[in-house]
Amino acid sequence: MEQTYQYAWIIPFLPLPVPMLIGLGLLLFPTATKSIRRMWAFQSVLLLSIVMIFSMNLSIQQINSSSVYQYVWSWIINNDISLEFGYLIDPLTSIMSILITTVGIMVLIYSDNYMSHDHGYLRFFAYMSFFSTSMLGLVTSSNLIQIYIFWELVGMCSYLLIGFWFTRPVAAKACQKAFVTNRVGDFGLLLGILGFYWITGSFEFRDLFQIFNNLISNNEVNLLFVTLCAVLLFAGAIAKSAQFPLHVWLPDAMEGPTPISALIHAATMVAAGIFLVARLMPLFIVIPHIMNFISLIGIITVFFGATLALAQKDIKRGLAYSTMSQLGYMMLALGMGSYRSALFHLITHAYSKALLFLGSGSVIHSMETLVGYCPKKSQNMVLMGGLTKHVPITKNSFLLGTLSLCGIPPLACFWSKDEILNDSWLYSPIFAIIAWSTAGLTAFYMCRIYLLTFEGHLNVHFQNYSGKRNTPLYSISLWGKEGSKISNKNFRLVTLLKMKKNGPPSFFSNKVYKMDENVGNLVQPFISIPNFGNTKTSLYPYESDNTMLFPILIFIPFTLFVGFLGIPFNQDVDILSKWLTPSINLLHKNSNNLIDWYEFSKDAVFSVSIASFGIFIAFFLYKPVYSSFQNLDLINSFVKMGPKRIFSDKIKNAIYDWSYNRGYIDAFYGTFLTVGVRKLAEFTHFFDRRIIDGIPNGVGFISFFVAEVIKSVGGGRISSYLFFYFSYVSIFLLIYYFLNF
C-alpha cells in the first residue's frame, strides 16, 4: 500500500504528454500531426483511463484503511527561505480524482464524434487533456501555493475552451467575461493566501490548520483580520463555482462546444470552488461568522439560479443556471457544516448533469441538420419539440437526468439533495423554506426544458424558416400563453389549423414545409461542416452516432445507482461515510449513521411531493397543447378571457422579465461598473492631461511668451539690451534703498 501512495504523484502528469506532443507536432510537423488526429484522441482517453484505474485503487485503499498520505519535497534556497512541493492523498482527493477521470473519459469519447468536423479538433483535445491535468493537480495539491498555481491553470484552460471558436464575437466576449469575473475572485484568493501565510508562516495544509487552531484557542490573532482573509479565500470559490454575485460568466460560457460545457459543469471548473471550500473546511469552522456567510451565499445562489432558469430559451443556458442553483445547494451544505452531504451532492449532480449536457449536445447535433450550423437556432428550445420519435435514446436518457435533478427516487440526486434539505431545518428554518421551495422550482424548470425539447411537435416545421422573427408561430410563449408582443392579437389556433396554402403548414397536415436551402448562409460559418453549407438540409432530426451515444448510455447507470453509495441504511453498507472518515459534520456531531425510518419516510414524501407539484405545473403550462382538438376550446377560452387575466399576466410577465434578463445583474454591472469605470478612466485622462501635464506645460508656455515679448521689445540691438539691463539694476537699487531707509 505504501508503494502505491509513493507513486501517486504521477496522477496529474499522466495526461500531460498529449497536449505537449500535439503542440510540438502542430508546430514542427502540422500535416503529419493532423493526419493521425484520431490517434491523439485515443492516447488522451488511454492515459486518462490509466489515471482512473490508479485513482480507483487509491480509493479502495482509502475505504479500507481511512488513511491520509502526504509527501513533500523541500527546496531550500537559504536558511530562511525554502519552497515545498508535494501531494496529498486523502478521501477528498480520491473522490475528486475518480470524478474527474470518469467524466473526463466519457467526454473525450463523446468529443471524438462531436468535434470530428471541426478544424480545431487537435487543439480541442490538447486543451481538454491539459484541463484534466490542471484539475488533477489541483485536487492532489498539499499546500496553498500549489493550489493557486493549478487554480490558475484550470481557469486558463476554461478560458481557452469557452473561447474555442474565438472568430465568433459572442464567444470571444464570453471568454473575456469569464476571465474578468474570475480575476476578481482569483485576486481575492491570492490576498487570502498571503494573509494566512503572514499569520501562520506556512502554506502546508496540516501545519496551517494546526498553527491556526492554536492561535485561535489562545486568542492570539485579530479576528477581524482573520475573517477578512477567510472572506478573500472564499471569494475565489465564489467566482470559480459561479456563486452570487460572481455568477455572470457561467451562462455565457455556453458559447463553447457542448462537451466542454459538460466537463466544466460536472467535474472541473465549477467543482473547483466546492473543492477549495471543502479542503479549507478545518480553517473556516474555527472562524466566527464565516460559516454563516458561506451558507448565506449558498442559499442566495440556490434561489437566484433557479429563478433565472425559469424562462431561458437556450437549452444549454437553462442547464447552466441549473448548475448554478445546484452548486448553491453544495455551498449551503458546506456552510451548514454538512461536509458529507455537500460532497455526496457533488458526486450525484456531476453524473446527472454530465448526462444532461451530453444529451443536449446530441439534441443540438440533430437540430443542426434542420437549421444549419447556428447556435442561436440549434440550441433554441422554441424551435424544438417532438423529438421523442426522432431521438428516442437521447430522449430517454435526458428524461432520467431530468428526473434525477428533480429529486425523484430512487435516482441519484434524490438521496443527496434530500439530505441537504433535511439538514437545512436543523440549521435555519428560513433557509430550509427557501431550499425546499427552490426544489419545487428545480422540478419545474427541468421538466419545462424536457417538455419543450422532446414533447409535442417539431416547431421548426411550423414556419417558413428564414431566420425572421415576424411570424406568429415564432412567438409561442414559453409561459404557456400566446406571445402578444409579436403575434397578431386576432390570431387563433383554429385559423392556424386552416392555413394550408398561403401560410405555415397545419399541425395535423401530412405535408411538410421545405426549409430554405440557403439557411446555412444566414450565419458566417467558422468551421467547415459537411451538409451544412448551401446544400439542402434534412427535414427531420436523427439520432446521434454510436460514439456519442456510448458515453450517454454509460452515464445512465451512474445516474441510477451512484446515489446508493451514500444511503445510510446500515453503517457497514454506507460506503461514502466510510470513505470520508473522519468527516466534519457540525449538525450531527453524535450521529451513528443509522437511519431513522420514520423521519426519512416523512421527509422523502414531503420532498417528492414538492418535486411532483413542480412537475405538474410544468406539464400544465408546457404540455403539447396542439396535440389534440380537445385543447382548442381551452386555449381559446384563455385568449378570450381578456381583462380578467391582466393582473396574473402582469405577475407572469414580471417573473419572465426577471428571469429572461438574468435578474438584471448583468445590466447592473454594465450600467454601474462598466460605465463607471469608463467615466473614471475619462476623468483620470482629463486630470492627467489638463491638470498634471497642464501645470508644467502652462509654466513653460508663460515663460516662452514672456521671453518672446522681451525679445520683440529689445529688437536685437545690443544698446537696447544694455539700456534695459541698467534700467532694471537701477530699479532694484532704488527699491533696496527705500526698503532700508
From Swiss-Prot:
Q: What is this protein called?
A: NAD(P)H-quinone oxidoreductase subunit 5, chloroplastic
What does it catalyze?
A: a plastoquinone + NADH + (n+1) H(+)(in) = a plastoquinol + NAD(+) + n H(+)(out); a plastoquinone + NADPH + (n+1) H(+)(in) = a plastoquinol + NADP(+) + n H(+)(out)
Q: Which organism is it from?
A: Flaveria ramosissima (Yellowtops)
The record's subcellular location field reads: Plastid, Chloroplast thylakoid membrane
Primary localisation category: plastid
Mark the transmembrane ranges: 9-29, 40-60, 89-109, 125-145, 147-167, 185-205, 219-239, 258-278, 284-304, 327-347, 354-374, 396-416, 425-445, 549-569, 605-625, 721-741
Would the keyword Plastid be found if you checked this record's keyword annotation? Answer: yes
What EC number(s) would the UniProt record show?
7.1.1.-
NCBIfam families, sorted: NDH_I_L, PRK06590.1
What is the name of the gene encoding this protein? ndhF
Q: Name one GO molecular function term.
A: quinone binding
Q: Which GO terms describe its biological process?
A: ATP synthesis coupled electron transport; electron transport coupled proton transport
Would you say which domain of life the source belongs to? Eukaryota
Hey, which family's this protein in?
A: Belongs to the complex I subunit 5 family.
Task: Name the InterPro entries for this protein.
Answer: NADH_UbQ_OxRdtase_chlpt_su5_C, NADHpl_OxRdtase_5_subgr, ND/Mrp_TM, NU5C-like, Proton_antipo_N
Query: Which cellular components does GO assign to this protein?
Result: chloroplast thylakoid membrane
Assembly: NDH is composed of at least 16 different subunits, 5 of which are encoded in the nucleus.
Protein's UniProt keywords contain Thylakoid? yes
The organism's lineage is: Eukaryota, Viridiplantae, Streptophyta, Embryophyta, Tracheophyta
| Record key words, sorted | Chloroplast, Membrane, NAD, NADP, Plastid, Plastoquinone, Quinone, Thylakoid, Translocase, Transmembrane, Transmembrane helix, Transport
Disulfide pattern:
none
Q: Which Gene3D superfamilies match?
A: 1.20.5.2700
Record membrane topology: Multi-pass membrane protein
Report the function annotation for this chain: NDH shuttles electrons from NAD(P)H:plastoquinone, via FMN and iron-sulfur (Fe-S) centers, to quinones in the photosynthetic chain and possibly in a chloroplast respiratory chain. The immediate electron acceptor for the enzyme in this species is believed to be plastoquinone. Couples the redox reaction to proton translocation, and thus conserves the redox energy in a proton gradient.
